[in-house]
Design a protein with these regions (language model features):
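Short amphipathic alpha-helical coupling elements at transmembrane boundaries
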Residues: 87, 91, 170-183, 513-514, ...
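Non-cytoplasmic
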Residues: 27-38, 204-220, 230, 545-560
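Hydrophobic alpha-helical segments
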Residues: 229, 236, 248-271, 276-278
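Alpha-helical membrane-interface segments at transmembrane helix boundaries
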Residues: 8-19, 87, 137-139, 234, ...
Length: 689
């Protein structure tokens, strides 16, 4: 009884927190389950409401009502705008949506900070609620009790609208049978826009009412997004009641769980998320990949097609046609030019720019590992920062222990990352499409929780700094100058990329490509597809570990932000910029991202996220097949292809409610997802004609 009494307040806090998450997650579930939009800017919609409500709060009921109306309306308009923004991506899958909405989240977050400031805003609740009441012998904030009532009413109203009104019937029809909805004379695109507007309104209302609980400030949008994703995954997309109970469970873990088991609670949420996704992926049925009825034409298609046509029609320069060796030499010439430019950078740039170039090489190796998984194995990932973090912290701890020889650090870090990839690989390789994207996200976030909690190894939130510098070889001096560090990073990157290219262009690489393009045929031919994917996952993990080791060597410090979700999104963006099967393109994309984040943003201080967000958006719209797709035939020549569409329904596809876990373990891809250079190998391991 004493134990129950001691934890009563955290338990009630968990109910309030869970109801807040339910309102937010209901909007996210509505957007994803009905409109088919994987909205990674949903936390920003919450932040819009929270900032607006905090700014208009003045301690009166009128201020609360005005803030609720304004915040809900602003987020509703933003949700409707999101419908227009995602319309051009109607048949490109959830990966393109994720990149676009993450870019919009960066832009929105930067604009909110510019308008409201970088500090967390205070929220003034009405004076009548700015007090405490007695609850079973404990003093408890009156506003939180009032919020519980308001959240229950809001949830009840939303459930009634969805299940008892003609509007709700149209929404359900859009999810279950869009063709029938169109036959009744309703415009599915209008329903799609209305659903996203309603999802935004829910997030905005939750932001206004929940601002005293999760206040508006830096990191709010990402925190709300991650918790909402956990709720949606645990509760599923078909049942509001399941979402409700999942939200309450998450709220209790965040409050009561921290009170009862503070060391265990940080790991529970994302571990449960990964476990649920893995189980669903094993018992799911394949989903049809189809586009929305009445999808609007791509407003940037003509601009993009003209750009591609111009670049493809440009003949090679006369000097290129005179190069010896024929087409093979001309294909290698750009690589040699790139290498020449990289080698000459120390003579052309200042020390700071050289250090940025070294960081770009480290991020580039991470991006190349994502290329192996996304472009060749067909496993789009947002969690490759996990083996990247293993390699980085392994190198930092080796340096602290006196193991400062570079090759030793690289080998041991790659080995540690490979072992990590081996352990988590079985959970990843059975899933496909959006499911694997969410599983890898959960693994990445779980690794981030370990980084923050395991202070004896990682330094926690403070990170690691002050460890000895790396020596290039046995008996060598410590590398302290930026030029020496860059040269070391360049040598490591050249070796790693060369090995990767040799493997990908070998028969083993052809087999791996076949697992993405014609998995069912390969299985029928007797190929152990699961084994191929597991080996690819291990090798990609080792490569990411080398990148993490290189980052620590170049930076000479390490913090959780260096291995967080944002870095995972940057790596995926680098892959899309270059073309998902272009290793060199991934390196170029990483260089462009680092230049935008650290060099261009230096001339416009405080606006790095805005510039990166613009880069995300521009890449998704203008480079659907990356830089590699601008020259050559379909797919960008030489087998280059755009980002693989997931198999769970296209953006705006009302039939996407099963996206989290409905794809079969065999993972047959949609036809549009098959790269031109991926014929199914025969049982002898050769490509079939």
């Amino acid at each position: 009884m004493d134990l129950l009494d001691a934890h009563l307040v955290p338990a009630v806090d968990g109910v309030a927190f869970g109801l807040l998450l339910f309102v937010v997650a209901a909007g996210l579930s509505l957007a994803f389950g009905t409109a088919g939009v994987l909205n990674l800017s949903h936390g920003t919609l919450y932040a819009i409401g929270a900032y607006t409500g905090a700014e208009l709060s003045d301690g009166t009921w009128g201020g609360l009502a005005l803030g609720l109306a304004a915040g809900t309306a602003a987020a509703c308009v933003a949700g409707a705008g999101l419908s227009a923004a995602t319309a051009p991506l109607a048949r490109r899958g959830h990966l393109a949506q994720a990149l676009l909405t993450f870019g919009l989240a960066l832009i929105g977050g930067d604009l909110l900070i510019q308008v409201f400031g970088a500090d967390e805003l205070p929220v003034r609740v009405p004076e009548a609620l700015d007090t405490s009441v007695t609850l079973l012998g404990h003093r408890y904030p009156a506003y939180r009790l009032c919020f519980i009532v308001m959240a229950v009413l809001l949830a009840a109203c939303g459930t009634w609208v969805l299940t008892r009104t003609r509007m709700g019937a149209a929404v359900r029809a859009a999810a279950d049978d869009p063709q029938m909805l169109a036959a009744t004379g309703r415009n599915p695109r209008a329903v799609h826009t209305g659903v996203l507007a309603a999802a935004g309104a829910l997030a905005g209302a939750a932001g206004v009412l929940g601002a005293p609980i999760i206040g508006p400030g830096p990191g709010t949008s990402e925190n709300v997004l991650m918790l909402s994703l956990v709720v949606v995954v645990l509760g599923g997309l078909r049942s509001l009641w399941a979402t409700f109970f999942a939200a309450i469970a998450v709220g209790e873990v965040q409050t009561l769980g921290v009170s009862l088991a503070p060391d265990l609670a940080p790991y529970l949420l994302f571990a449960a998320m990964a476990a649920v996704l893995v189980l669903r992926s094993r018992f799911a049925e394949p989903a049809a990949a189809h586009g929305p009825e009445g999808a609007a034409p791509d407003p940037v298609a003509r601009l993009r097609s003209r750009l591609v046509a111009v670049l493809r029609r440009r003949p090679l320069p006369a000097w290129a046609n005179r190069l010896p060796g024929g087409p093979a030499w001309r294909q290698a010439a750009p690589l040699l030019v790139l290498l020449l430019v990289l080698v000459s950078l120390p003579a052309l740039l200042d020390a700071y720019s050289i250090s940025l170039a070294g960081s770009a090489l480290a991020l580039g190796l991470l991006a190349v590992s994502v290329t192996v998984l996304t472009g060749y194995a067909g496993l789009p990932t947002l969690g490759q920062t996990a083996p990247f973090a293993v390699g980085a912290y392994a190198t930092a701890n080796l340096a602290e222990a006196g193991w400062t020889v570079g090759p030793v650090q690289l080998v041991l870090s790659a080995l540690a990352a490979a072992v990590f990839a081996l352990v988590v690989g079985p959970a990843v390789i059975r899933a496909r499409g959006t499911t694997v994207l969410m599983i890898t996200l959960a693994i990445g976030e779980l690794t981030g929780a370990v980084v923050n909690q395991l202070k004896s190894v990682t330094g926690g939130a403070d990170g690691l700094v002050g460890f000895p510098a790396t020596r290039a070889l046995w008996g060598g001096e410590e590398m302290l100058e930026e030029s020496r560090l860059y040269t070391y990073a360049l040598v490591v990157a050249v070796v790693a990329v060369s090995v990767t290219l040799l493997v990908l262009r070998s028969p083993a690489g052809k087999l791996l490509t076949g697992t993405r393009g014609a998995e069912a045929r390969m299985r029928a031919s007797g190929h152990p597809v699961g084994r191929y994917l597991l080996v690819a996952h291990i090798c990609a993990g080792a490569l990411a570990g080398v990148g993490g080791s290189l980052m620590v060597t170049v930076q000479q410090y390490l913090s959780p932000a260096d291995v967080g979700f944002e870095i995972a999104a940057f790596a995926l963006l680098a892959v899309v910029i270059g073309g998902t099967t272009s290793v060199i393109g991934a390196l170029l994309g990483a260089g462009l991202i680092v230049a935008t984040r650290d060099w261009v943003a230096g001339s416009w201080p405080g606006h790095g996220p805005l510039l990166l967000g613009v880069l995300f958006v521009a890449t998704v719209y203008l480079l659907p097949r990356g830089l590699a797709g601008l020259r050559g035939g379909p797919g960008g020549g030489n087998g280059e292809s755009g980002p693989p569409s997931d198999t769970t329904g296209a953006p705006g596809t009302p039939g996407a409610p099963g996206a989290l876990g409905v794809t079969s373990a065999s993972g047959a891809s949609a036809a549009e997802d098959q790269p031109p250079s991926a014929p199914a190998p025969t049982s002898a391991g050769k490509a079939s004609p």
